[in-house]
């Protein structure tokens, strides 16, 4: 007896352990987005990254029921607009037939069939739809409108000649079509297509009832059979519970006893203060007490539920995944918080995906029984539900005695598009007809969209590489800066491409660089007014140093801090007061009335209201001069966290960043290091607009710290020993670029030597002119922006967008990102790239062994791919992979957004962030020989996964020969640019003027560094 009990306990423990493994595996398929306050872009299909790109899309589409590409209609619209050309389609088909030879039977080859299917819809039709198209629309009496005129004439002429030898057929057609030769040609072709009976197309998949437990759940079965979704009984309860349990600060009253864990809180909710009173859940309280009496753990409860549902253990993985994907946003957040506790504030309750699964399956059993009883009249055990549904399912209809015209009708459409008349179709055997249809059917919708997508990307890739090739044909002296007056290091962010271009157009002596926006300085930072520290570094990096912003005068700082605390306590008390019964009755009407004045101002005059608010803040909280301080600086006493920031550590950080971007000599008198971030109001996705290299936060503190370290005399001595000799006359300045308003702030200007003050004024003037021109360029993409007007008016518009409460698009973020160029600026200086390119500075001449390139690609590759792929997937299916429109979004638990007051957490990007995006994979152009790139590819698994599996596309520009080669999977193939010149204009504004859509590359003469008559911008 004891032996049998031990065996049962052992088997139960093994099943529970298996369930934990299943849940952990399923968790990888859930959205990995963390709390929305620190939004970091990532590959939406991270769990499939080990697969080739197109295979991953197919697998994910099957699991998530999501779209892998744009629709065929979208791609055909791009064909019509010229965004996909004939050469692009042929290149995509050539890639498809590279591994399999073409085949021809009868008048058509497989490649010709596929070419026609790409350009024209040849859809299968239902019986009812086909009947309508034939009898009502009369589509067999005329040729398709999209048949080219030349083929139309040839078909009519061929049919007339064919009918001359067949007077009986001609007579019948005369009765049916009259004397219209096109109608006769169409009817004759239709008769020829249906003259030979064809077998029906095979079914695509077995009935759903046969797939329950094997990719589909009992919920799916009841939705199909009963027309009611059991999840509608469960989801409102789970959403309210999870919102309260996971809340990080929205709720006025916190859920009690959260420290006991998710399952115990769920159990308490059901048993105590919030009984589940719905009729569907009668008996739940008694069952929960039985669980307590048996001391069942959440894994044991989940296992028991699966057994009651009769789900075989070897099918648990697909079934559990299906259940968790019923609320993927909430389930994904639980999984994320369980494995990344650093995302949460101190004191947060424990979370467990297994406990969530146990709670959901417990409710699911009751909901399934309720729907089955009410809708199907089934009152038996859930284990018998599938068999009951199988018996109750409608038997298949007997074969119809009437002929099946579905496949002949597709043959009829195919023949028209190919220009084949009845004369060519009539002689075809049944086998030849079936072969043509099978070739068409095998080239199904998803395959067609894949090929169209590859053609779409081919067009984009050709445009970009053609632009770079044309730019490289210009003399080197036109593309490089010999004696720079100003040097500005921007983040690699694609939004900086336009600002860099406009700054360079102002003078041939303006030089820019691109480097990851934390500037190689990962820190834990606390600003003067911040409540705590934040990590300003890429996700996955643990900062070793702590930096604090302190006032120069401690007394002034304490006065400001005290005044700020008093004001914050007052506002907090008012906010809490409006939520209480007694004070709320008094405060709400009064405050509501008073708030109408600023509300009207912020709505109708957002820019003016924002300026007034900032002026009041400066009056109430006067700014104080500050400095950056490390509590663990060398020689300091204990205090703070992290390691001491020694001179050697500073020099190592500065040297690595300067070497990465190739700035080791030729320093300008003023070098600006410019971080970036964004500002907006009423925008839960604010963090998604900030610097990804800083973990979804502003990069200004990193830039300021880097400049301070580079100005340190002791650091410069150590840098000189490493071969980086920064002249005494060079001064570094940190700064911050607001990508929403285009504002640029330079820090610590009071430290600039008096000898540089004039140049500093000129630099500020140049940056101001560049940001105005950049705002002008950005405005062409905003539907509400002024179409006419100067740069100053455009700047005022973008400033107003950042302060507008009603603005759903304060800026467009990384929308349009498509390219990453890793190399010297001479590759792209003077090339218009439409703000679509991540620009990463790298000098191959200073990196003969490829070590720097390896470092750069390992950092930039995953980051760029993550941004690009999140935009890709949110664009191709904003319902499944994206967050939908912002308009109904509400902040939920300070974790994410949901639609209205009761929905799943919406992950991914909202519609307003991707509306104008072109979903293409990131094209990474590296200035390196193919040998160097191949060596890095072979050595680094992370690069091999991204490049080899096609998640990003790679092209190399040889530093010696300037030839371009593209990675194909089997090696590198030379790129041959189109035999046509690239357009050239004087300035960027001349090229984008009057255009609101995408603009292809062009050469910009104003950015040329060749000596010419030019006046340096100054104020």
Curated annotation (Swiss-Prot):
Bilayer disposition of the protein: Peripheral membrane protein
Primary localization class, coarse: membrane
Function (record text): Part of an energy-coupled inorganic carbon pump.
GO CC entries: plasma membrane
Protein name per its UniProtKB record: Probable inorganic carbon transporter subunit DabA 1
UniProt-listed Pfam families: DabA (PF10070)
Cofactor(s) required, per the database record: Zn(2+)
Keyword Zinc: yes
Binding partners and assembly: Forms a complex with DabB.
Region (Disordered): 624-643
Alphabetized UniProt keyword annotations: Cell inner membrane, Cell membrane, Membrane, Metal-binding, Transport, Zinc
Coiled coil location: none
Protein family (similarity comment): Belongs to the inorganic carbon transporter (TC 9.A.2) DabA family.
Subcellular location: Cell inner membrane
């Amino acid at each position: 007896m004891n032996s049998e009990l031990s065996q049962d306990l052992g088997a139960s423990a093994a099943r529970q352990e298996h369930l934990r493994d299943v849940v952990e595996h399923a968790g990888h398929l859930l959205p990995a987005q963390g709390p929305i306050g620190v939004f970091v872009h990532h590959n939406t299909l991270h769990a499939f990254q080990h697969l080739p790109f197109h295979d991953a899309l197919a697998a994910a589409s099957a699991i998530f029921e999501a779209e892998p590409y744009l629709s065929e209609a979208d791609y055909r619209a791009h064909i019509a607009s010229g965004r996909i050309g004939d050469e692009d389609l042929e290149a995509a088909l050539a890639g498809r037939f590279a591994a399999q030879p073409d085949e021809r039977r009868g008048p058509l080859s497989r490649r010709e069939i596929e070419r026609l299917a790409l350009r024209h819809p040849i859809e299968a039709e239902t019986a009812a739809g086909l009947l309508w198209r034939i009898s009502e629309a009369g589509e067999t009496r005329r040729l398709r409108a999209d048949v080219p005129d030349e083929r139309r004439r040839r078909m009519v002429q061929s049919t007339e000649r064919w009918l001359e030898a067949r007077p009986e057929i001609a007579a019948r057609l005369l009765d049916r079509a009259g004397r219209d030769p096109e109608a006769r040609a169409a009817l004759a072709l239709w008769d020829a297509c249906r003259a030979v009976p064809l077998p029906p197309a095979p079914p695509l998949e077995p009935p759903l009832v046969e797939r329950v437990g094997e990719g589909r759940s009992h919920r799916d079965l009841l939705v199909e059979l009963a027309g009611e979704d059991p999840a509608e009984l469960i989801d409102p309860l789970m959403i309210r519970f999870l919102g309260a349990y996971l809340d990080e600060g929205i709720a006025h009253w916190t859920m009690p006893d959260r420290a006991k864990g998710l399952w115990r809180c769920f159990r308490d909710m059901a048993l105590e203060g919030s009984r589940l009173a719905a009729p569907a859940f009668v008996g739940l309280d008694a069952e929960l007490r039985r669980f307590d009496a048996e001391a069942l753990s959440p894994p044991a409860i989940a296992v028991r539920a699966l057994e009651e549902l009769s789900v075989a253990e070897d099918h648990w993985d697909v079934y559990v995944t299906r259940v968790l994907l019923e609320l993927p946003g909430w389930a994904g957040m639980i999984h994320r918080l369980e494995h990344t506790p650093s995302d949460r504030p101190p004191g947060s309750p424990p979370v467990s995906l297994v406990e969530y699964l146990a709670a959901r399956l417990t409710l699911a059993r009751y909901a399934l029984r309720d729907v089955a009883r009410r809708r199907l009249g089934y009152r038996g055990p859930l284990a018998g539900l599938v068999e009951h549904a199988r018996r109750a399912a409608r038997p298949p209809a007997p074969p119809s005695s009437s002929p099946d015209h579905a496949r002949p009708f597709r043959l009829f459409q195919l023949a028209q598009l190919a220009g084949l008349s009845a004369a060519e179709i009539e002689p075809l055997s049944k086998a030849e007809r079936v072969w043509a249809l099978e070739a068409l059917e095998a080239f199904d919708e998803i395959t067609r969209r894949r090929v169209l997508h590859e053609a779409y990307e081919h067009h984009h890739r050709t445009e970009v590489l053609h632009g770079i090739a044309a730019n490289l044909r210009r003399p080197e002296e036109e593309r490089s800066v010999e004696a720079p007056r100003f040097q500005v290091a921007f983040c690699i962010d694609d939004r900086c491409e336009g600002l860099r271009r406009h700054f360079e157009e102002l003078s041939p002596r303006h030089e820019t660089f691109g480097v990851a926006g934390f500037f190689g300085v990962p820190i834990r930072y606390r600003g003067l007014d911040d409540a705590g520290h934040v990590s300003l570094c890429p996700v996955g990096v643990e900062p070793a140093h702590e930096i604090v912003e302190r006032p120069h005068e401690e007394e002034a700082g304490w006065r400001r801090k005290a005044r700020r605390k008093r004001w914050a306590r007052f506002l907090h008390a008012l906010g809490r007061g409006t939520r209480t019964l007694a004070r709320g009755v008094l405060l709400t009407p009064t405050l509501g009335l008073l708030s109408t004045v600023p509300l009207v101002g912020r709505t109708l005059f957002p820019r003016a209201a924002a300026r007034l608010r900032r002026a009041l803040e400066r009056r109430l909280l006067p700014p104080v001069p500050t400095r950056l301080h490390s509590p663990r600086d060398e020689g300091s006493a204990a205090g703070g966290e992290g390691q001491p920031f020694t001179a050697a550590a500073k020099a190592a950080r500065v040297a690595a960043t300067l070497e990465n971007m190739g700035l080791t000599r030729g320093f300008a008198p003023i070098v600006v290091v410019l971080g970036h971030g964004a500002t907006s109001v009423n925008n839960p996705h604010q963090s998604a607009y900030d610097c990804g290299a800083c973990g979804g936060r502003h990069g200004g503190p990193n830039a300021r710290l880097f400049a301070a370290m580079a100005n340190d005399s002791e650091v410069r001595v150590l840098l000189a020993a490493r071969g980086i000799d920064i002249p005494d006359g060079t001064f570094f300045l940190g700064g911050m670029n607001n990508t929403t308003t285009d504002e640029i702030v330079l820090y610590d200007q009071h430290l600039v030597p008096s000898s540089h003050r004039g140049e500093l004024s000129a630099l500020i003037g140049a940056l101001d002119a560049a940001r105005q021109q950049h705002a002008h360029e950005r405005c062409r993409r905003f539907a509400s922006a002024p179409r006419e007007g100067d740069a100053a008016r455009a700047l005022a518009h973008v400033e107003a967008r950042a302060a507008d409460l009603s603005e759903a698009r304060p800026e467009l973020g990384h929308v349009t990102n498509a390219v990453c160029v890793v190399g010297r600026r001479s590759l792209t200086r003077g090339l218009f790239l439409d703000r679509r390119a991540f620009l990463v500075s790298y000098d191959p001449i200073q990196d003969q062994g490829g070590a720097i390139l390896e470092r750069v690609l390992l950092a930039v590759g995953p980051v760029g791919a993550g941004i690009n792929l999140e935009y890709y997937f949110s664009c191709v299916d904003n319902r499944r992979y994206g967050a939908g429109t912002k308009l109904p979004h509400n902040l939920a638990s300070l974790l994410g957004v949901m639609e209205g007051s009761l929905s799943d957490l919406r992950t991914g990007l909202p519609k307003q962030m991707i509306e104008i995006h072109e979903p293409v994979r990131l094209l990474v152009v590296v200035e390196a020989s193919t040998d160097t790139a191949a060596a890095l590819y072979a050595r680094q698994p992370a690069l091999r996964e991204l490049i080899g599996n096609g998640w990003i596309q790679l092209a190399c520009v040889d530093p010696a020969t300037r030839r371009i080669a593209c990675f194909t999977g089997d090696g590198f193939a030379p790129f041959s640019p189109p035999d046509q010149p690239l357009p050239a204009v004087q300035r960027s504004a001349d090229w984008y003027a009057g255009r609101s859509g995408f603009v292809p590359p062009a050469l910009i003469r104003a950015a040329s560094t060749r000596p010419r008559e030019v006046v340096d911008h100054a104020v």
